[in-house]
């Protein structure tokens, strides 16, 4: 809305809708975190309880359990996959609308200006979501703590 119809932004995005979107995002994040934490807490941990990672994340913690963590891995992939795919779908749909709006601009200079503005945003979104996706969307059989540590450093440096 902000790019396609900038003058209509305050009408089509009232403060109440923005608040609902923020509340929904926070609620989804809390629900995901609580589910992962509640499913991880009853698992027994044995041996050296030193996490070989920079962050106390779910995947490194699952590597320390003595029991079968397949249910937790399934929950992790399901929740993170659903969240990631929903966000990706929303982003792709919004970029399609933006692309259609940009292509309807008559002047070449205006199209170039709009594309250059959107290109930096697209690069930022890509640099934000690709490392997060690589870190959280690996199935347990392909999961590598070393690869996730590299991804975590890359993500931390970018963000």
Swiss-Prot record:
Entries under Pfam families matching the protein: 7tm_4
Function: Odorant receptor.
This protein's GO CC annotations: plasma membrane
Protein name in UniProt: Olfactory receptor-like protein COR8
Keywords for this protein: Cell membrane, G-protein coupled receptor, Glycoprotein, Membrane, Olfaction, Receptor, Sensory transduction, Transducer, Transmembrane, Transmembrane helix
Subcellular location, record wording: Cell membrane
Glycosylation sites: 80
InterPro entries listed in its UniProt record: GPCR_Rhodpsn_7TM, Olfact_rcpt
Membrane topology recorded in Swiss-Prot or TrEMBL: Multi-pass membrane protein
Gene: COR8
Segments passing through the bilayer: 17-41, 83-103, 117-137, 149-159
Gene Ontology molecular function, alphabetical: G protein-coupled receptor activity; odorant binding; olfactory receptor activity
Homology family: Belongs to the G-protein coupled receptor 1 family.
Extracellular side: 42-82, 138-148
């Amino acid at each position: 809305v902000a790019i396609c119809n900038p003058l209509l932004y305050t009408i089509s995005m009232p403060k109440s809708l923005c608040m609902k979107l923020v509340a929904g995002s926070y609620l989804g994040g809390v629900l995901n975190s609580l589910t992962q934490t509640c499913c991880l807490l009853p698992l027994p941990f044995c041996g050296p309880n030193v996490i070989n990672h920079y962050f106390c994340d779910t995947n490194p913690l699952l590597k320390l359990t003595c029991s079968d963590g397949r249910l937790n891995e399934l929950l992790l992939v399901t929740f993170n996959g659903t969240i990631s795919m929903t966000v990706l779908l929303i982003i792709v749909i919004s970029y399609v609308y933006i692309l259609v709006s940009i292509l309807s601009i008559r002047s070449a200079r205006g199209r170039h200006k709009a594309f250059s503005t959107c290109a930096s945003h697209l690069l930022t979104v890509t640099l934000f979501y690709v490392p997060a996706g690589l870190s959280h969307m690996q199935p347990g059989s392909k999961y590598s703590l070393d690869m996730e540590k590299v991804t975590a450093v890359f993500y931390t440096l970018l963000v």
